[in-house]
């Protein structure tokens, strides 16, 4: 994505991505109330009306955000989140999610959870029904079962086909062979077409309600074909999302390891605390990611980042 971009272009391109994300705002509200605003990654656009309706009805901002991302978590056509997400290298879908609630400044998360379609809702229960902030793996699954979440096979047939083709073409030294060109499934052929990239797919959503309170969530199936147990930034408070009810909310998608190393979402909120506008705060995080990207394998021949990150920022005043 960034092979032909200078560092300055990297920053400006990321800023442009901020403007291309879903942004929802309701009509004017009565005096004494805040104007509700929703900021989300592009795959959250179709959930805006539902979330705004909930906010207008007085639903908590975090609950509205979770209801919105649940639509995407259940969509088998979104292969970066929830049901139908691309699996790890062993063909198993592992999900990560986190939530933060502005009025109580509390948060919860789950990581590497299997067989549960709605990890964001489980993360909310971690926040509300335990003294912990993060549950992982088998412990997260047992907790979800305890609270009545049904287990489902998250691997759809389409995602299985994509994973299998990747498995069959991943090495020349094993005994697997991919199908011939005329036998290849059209879906697989399209997926691995000229524009194919190994994605870090995610959905983030930040909500500001009419009372001026904030809530946010980030949920993902993670890096395609990841090492089992790999956890990116999405379920880590401060990295994949962060908020302060007196300042604003932020979230991230893209290369999770870069956001983990720089606590990007926390960086954005703290920049807004110092008076930066949301866009400038997000660019501040971009600059930090670029400046600290020192490993040769993550830089092109000119020393520029060879990966992408996207940031989503919403200030307390609705900007």
What are these regions (language model features)?
Residues 2, 12-19, 27-319:
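Alpha/propeptide regions of enzymes that mature by internal proteolysis
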């Amino acid at each position: 994505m960034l092979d032909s971009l200078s560092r300055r272009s990297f920053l400006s391109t990321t800023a442009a991505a901020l403007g291309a994300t879903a942004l929802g705002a309701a009509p004017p509200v009565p005096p004494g109330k805040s104007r509700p605003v929703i900021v989300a990654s592009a795959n959250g656009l179709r959930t805006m009306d539902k979330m705004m309706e909930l906010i207008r009805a007085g639903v908590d901002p975090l609950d509205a955000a979770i209801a919105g991302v649940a639509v995407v978590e259940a969509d088998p056509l979104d292969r970066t989140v929830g049901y139908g997400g691309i699996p790890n290298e062993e063909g198993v879908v592992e999900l990560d999610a986190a939530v933060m609630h502005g009025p109580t400044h509390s948060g919860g998360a789950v990581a590497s959870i299997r067989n549960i379609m709605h990890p964001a809702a489980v993360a909310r229960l971690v926040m509300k029904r335990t003294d912990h902030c993060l549950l992982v793996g088998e412990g997260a699954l047992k907790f979800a079962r305890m609270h009545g979440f049904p287990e489902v096979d998250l691997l759809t047939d389409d995602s299985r086909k994509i994973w299998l083709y990747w498995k069959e073409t991943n090495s020349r030294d094993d005994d697997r062979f991919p199908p011939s060109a005329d036998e290849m499934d059209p879906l697989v052929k399209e997926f691995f077409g000229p524009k194919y990239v190994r994605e870090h797919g995610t959905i983030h959503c930040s909500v500001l309600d009419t009372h001026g309170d904030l809530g946010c969530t980030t949920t993902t199936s993670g890096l395609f074909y990841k090492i089992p147990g790999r956890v990116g930034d999405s379920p880590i408070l401060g990295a994949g999302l962060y908020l302060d009810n007196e300042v604003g909310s932020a979230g991230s998608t893209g290369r999770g390891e870069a956001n983990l190393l720089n606590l990007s979402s926390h960086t954005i909120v703290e920049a807004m605390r110092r008076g930066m506008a949301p866009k400038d705060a997000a660019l501040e995080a971009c600059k930090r990611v670029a400046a600290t990207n020192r490993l040769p394998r993550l830089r092109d021949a000119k020393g520029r980042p060879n990966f992408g990150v996207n940031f989503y920022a919403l200030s307390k005043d609705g900007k």
